[in-house]
């Protein structure tokens, strides 16, 4: 006997799925892309404002997708299922490997409220002072702020693609007033 898996987001009633004019349209100009991106962020903001939504589950799932994208950037073959298994099957004292470490960075970054301390915990190879400096590099509207943080990190540490994307997502979340990092940018860059 098989059971249908419950879909907690569809049970909420508000808000419904992404409007078709956002998800089916193709941006032909920079203005279109800007508009559709803003509309998608606005819709996500409504989901994150809904108290009944499983925020931690959403962030964890997006963190897995972001880790998968970052692992692919580095040329590694691991995909979401292997990353998930690598993390969940770790025994005390085991090392997760490079791909597993990337996955852990994203999960740690998304699970705690935004702060330099939480980001330093998620990115153990980066000093808290450096995180604060990069975070402060972003000024302006939310997407511009995220882009400036990404640019600042990659100009100082060109091989730190995953940490750069984590910090850019943190800047975006902070600018939008979200209490937690929501992994969005890495999957979009892939």
Task: List the model feature ranges, each with a label.
Residues 1-190:
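FIC/Doc superfamily catalytic core
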